[in-house]
């Protein structure tokens, strides 16, 4: 049986590890809530912008207009954008995105397309750089809660590449936040743009609460303040194509920001779940080690008693 000191050291190490994972779980839980609130705050603007673009798009069907960002070209070159995190300890979050990106890359190459990668996050950069993928751009160091300025910088580069005919389509692989324990890697086409209704009547949110003295997260719902429908008879001062070409870059920035926000929320939720599982496992391991320690201590005491009894019997004999 293991030495008592070794078991004591392991118990101490496991308990210290549990303190760390529990702290990381609480930090991730607080940041998940903040990330969700950011998504909810931006939804009314995104909804109103989407409705305006739909209205303009429907009018353009009956007019001669030119909207380069919506132009459906013959596709030869595709830019594939993958969003991962800069850090680990978040379960399968990064691995799932990398796997989905590799699958999509193989699909497109199999169909004869020229594919370029734009990788966001140090995990994707490290993985694809070591495997000789055609990487066009590497982006890292984004805020944990993405900002509009960061989305605008990335969107500007995408627009320049698309308008210069450097790429015919831009696809984004990111993690869609479904709920606290469920996140799904999804594929979305960013360019050419196709405005559509993005309103979601109800968003699931999570509130910090306590359960038997322990901080935890409780799911709930919050109705989104969606924008009203745009009247069909509204009169715009500018022509539809002028408005469309002015608003489409803003729409792209907003869509990209949403992808970054959902990815950030998914990473934090995955980290919270991973740290929660690690804390539970550490608790169970500490119990097992404590039981082993008590058994070893009992065996040592029993052995000492037997030796004393044996010695007394020998002396008396």
From Swiss-Prot:
CDD domains recorded: F1-ATPase_gamma (cd12151)
GO molecular function, one term: ATP binding
Stored Gene3D superfamilies: 3.40.1380.10, ATP synthase, gamma subunit, helix hairpin domain
Keyword Membrane: yes
Database matches in Pfam families: ATP-synt
Location, primary (coarse class): membrane
Cited InterPro entries: ATP_synth_F1_ATPase_gsu, ATP_synth_F1_gsu
Alphabetically ordered keywords of this record: ATP synthesis, CF(1), Hydrogen ion transport, Ion transport, Membrane, Thylakoid, Transport
Membrane-topology descriptor: Peripheral membrane protein
Compartments it resides in: Cellular thylakoid membrane
Disulfide bonds: none
GO terms for cellular component: plasma membrane-derived thylakoid membrane; proton-transporting ATP synthase complex
Recorded family membership: Belongs to the ATPase gamma chain family.
Function text: Produces ATP from ADP in the presence of a proton gradient across the membrane. The gamma chain is believed to be important in regulating ATPase activity and the flow of protons through the CF(0) complex.
Record text on subunit structure and interactions: F-type ATPases have 2 components, CF(1) - the catalytic core - and CF(0) - the membrane proton channel. CF(1) has five subunits: alpha(3), beta(3), gamma(1), delta(1), epsilon(1). CF(0) has three main subunits: a, b and c.
UniProt-recorded name of the protein: ATP synthase gamma chain
